[in-house]
Amino acid sequence: MKMTISQTKQPLASVEEHTRVTIKTLFQFLHAQGQGDYLGEQVTQLEHSLQCAYLATQSPKHGNDPEVILAALLHDVGRFIPAAEKMGKMITPDGKYIGRQSHEALGESYLRQIGFSEKVCTLVGAHVMAKRYLVATDQSYYDALSETSKRTLKFQVSHLSLLIFSIFKVY
């Protein structure tokens, strides 16, 4: 159960300071890790995150929802927080690094621990599953993915998952 500010019995200034520090820390992680290339793509991690947030604002259904936009911005937080170093790396047979295993679960857990809303946390945790679903049910979505994104699917999806999604689509 989420507590309201009055239930925390902390002075408002203390809550505001905690929020400021949390946001500053998150953006320091994003800025520090976001300058390098994003898995071999033509954009940095920071640019990718900002693009996703921008695209979320363009959604006819969710573009006015700040939690959706925030989740889009932070969807890859599990790639760049310090705890990500402990997560397994996804390496292609030819030796290319293409991301961290279970970064979505790590990101969801991290955001929940620092007090983000359930909606933001759930969306961050579900973004890889959403990609799997879209790939399984929409060929044009798959066709529009970059080669790097397609390679990450080999680590993120199984043929059984594709079969299950296909069955759900029928029903």
For each feature predicted by the language model, list its residue ranges.
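Acidic/His-rich, divalent-metal-binding segments that scaffold phosphate/diphosphate chemistry
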Residues: 2-98
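Divalent metal-dependent catalytic cores for phosphoryl transfer on phosphate-bearing substrates
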Residues: 54-171
